Amino acid sequence: MTKLSHIRNFSIVAHIDHGKSTLADRLIQACGAIEAREMKEQMLDSMDIERERGITIKAQTVRLDYKAKDGKTYQLNLMDTPGHVDFAYEVSRSLAACEGSLLVVDASQGVEAQTLANVYHALDAGHEVVPVLNKIDLPAAEPERVKQQIEDVIGLDTSDAVMISAKTGIGIGDVLEALVNRLPCPEGDADAPLQALLVDSWYDPYLGVIILVRIKNGVLKKGQKIRMMATQAAYQVDSCGYFTPKLVQTTELRPGEMGFFTAAIKAVADTKVGDTVTDDKKPADTPLPGFKPSVPVVWCGLFPIDAADYEDLRDSLAKLRLNDASFQYEPETSAALGFGFRCGFLGLLHLEIIQERLEREFNLDLITTAPSVVYRVHKTNGEMEELHNPADMPDPARIDHMEEPWIKATIMVPDEYLGPVLTLCTERRGQQIDLTYAGSRAMAVYKLPLNEVVFDFYDRLKSISRGYASFDYEVDSYAQSDLVKVSILVNAEPVDALSFVVHRANAESRGRGICTRLKELIPRQMFQIAIQAAIGGRIVARESISALRKDVTAKCYGGDATRKRKLLEKQKEGKKRMRQFGKVEIPQSAFLAALKMGDS
């Protein structure tokens, strides 16, 4: 049994690619938790997609035993957290389970937008933050400049920042000593009623749902009857233990410790992340603070390219939902694309990852419709409904006004690219809140409509700043806006999958963009095809695909002109009839390209 004073719970916060998972690997190696032959890169990133993209999606935990220079053995619980904004709720929960953080900053790149967001999360959670400068072995490293930047931008004292290179292993011992000496030990009472914070949960085919917890008070034992305070569901603990990263079973988890338990729980949806686990017979009076259900921010339609894959898609979504409770879906039908699902995500990266996992792990070929955000529609009869799908928008005559979500975005950019970045934000209806400088980098804070960001804001930002700008956002509030639904008509038939909601000022340009793209992609027919963008009954943009023409007069040599005229008139009649009854088949490739985001 480890004394409370010998336990340290910490997480590592960093921007993507600043070396967080590599540092975790080195700490695991230095404490001898894994033999050298079993070591692999990004030890804690369990999904292939996490390893390939170099990002952490699910929070993971590992217990390390470290013999410090003072001769005592300390139990270090490392919580590896996601760094990306879409998983900000996972970050805030992981931080609530710890008392301190290592702030990892790349010594060549300096402070980035997500570094800021995550550090503020850590400071809000009351953490002791230890700055760590990584990649000091790089020729481009400028540790002194970056130290100054951390002091200017974040306000942390960097006089005793730890200098390391996680890749080569320089300074790892200093990090371990800093953890022991500078971070506070956890507090807790083993005799109080059980209070454990549910940090994460995932589905294991053999054990059912594995639940990751941090014990605040009381003791969690094998065979104990427990209750979830948010859902009021009761279970019996089958097994409990911890990860080193290998799974090790024990009989109990005590205050200050992090570990897991299993309890014959069938679905991850039954375990709400951030919930409090307590004893069924002797429950705690109050749950631990900070629980909030996660709400999808971005919605889009997923349709199988081959209609026969519909059942497989449904089963695959159900399996993914077992592991990711923040992801939601409901069945949807589209006249153009057939049967599919309307899915809700935490953000664009979350959407990409789910789509990639469906294609990779379940071998599905999918079409994704353009992502849309959740609008609030206030009707004239006083009702308010949330709109996930542009096709479901009520008749404009019944709408009083609409509201759209706005975000607070933080953009870090080298000052030579600041002009184009500010122009981009203004084009996207942004309102500047703040602009500050730290050395040669500027930090701009803007309020932006989320609708303008989901299309291609991130790609545009990266291209105008040559990849140097970093971007982070949080959903701020809803505000009233002049929004309209743009329908795309092909040969006077509306194509539901291509309709979208947009601000009135941008409706024409966005509609024209899609019409132009479809004109290039739909094959020519024997009759003229009109592609139109309409707001209600008013056409705002139109492109025409001219008809293929067969030369019907080719067989006439000389002779009377009336013969030719008769043939041409006959052809004209036929074309007219075709235009009336002809159906235009839009090929899949045209759909995919038209749905590719962007205003081009």
UniProtKB/Swiss-Prot annotation:
EC category name: hydrolase
GO biological process, one term: positive regulation of translation
Residue stretches spanning the membrane: none
GO molecular function, one term: guanosine tetraphosphate binding
Gene3D superfamilies found in the cross-reference section: 3.30.70.240, Elongation factor 4, C-terminal domain, Elongation Factor G (Translational Gtpase), domain 3, P-loop containing nucleotide triphosphate hydrolases, Translation factors
UniProt KW keywords: Cell inner membrane, Cell membrane, GTP-binding, Hydrolase, Membrane, Nucleotide-binding, Protein biosynthesis
Any one cellular-component term (Gene Ontology): plasma membrane
Domain tr-type G: start-end pairs: 5-187
E.C. no: 3.6.5.n1
Membrane topology: Peripheral membrane protein
Swiss-Prot/TrEMBL catalytic activity: GTP + H2O = GDP + phosphate + H(+)
Protein's cellular compartments: Cell inner membrane
UniProt-annotated binding residues for GTP: 17-22, 134-137
HAMAP family: LepA (MF_00071)
Sequence similarity: Belongs to the TRAFAC class translation factor GTPase superfamily. Classic translation factor GTPase family. LepA subfamily.
Functional description taken from the UniProt entry: Required for accurate and efficient protein synthesis under certain stress conditions. May act as a fidelity factor of the translation reaction, by catalyzing a one-codon backward translocation of tRNAs on improperly translocated ribosomes. Back-translocation proceeds from a post-translocation (POST) complex to a pre-translocation (PRE) complex, thus giving elongation factor G a second chance to translocate the tRNAs correctly. Binds to ribosomes in a GTP-dependent manner.
Name the UniProt record assigns to this protein: Elongation factor 4
Species per Swiss-Prot/TrEMBL record: Paramagnetospirillum magneticum (strain ATCC 700264 / AMB-1)
Gene that this sequence comes from: lepA
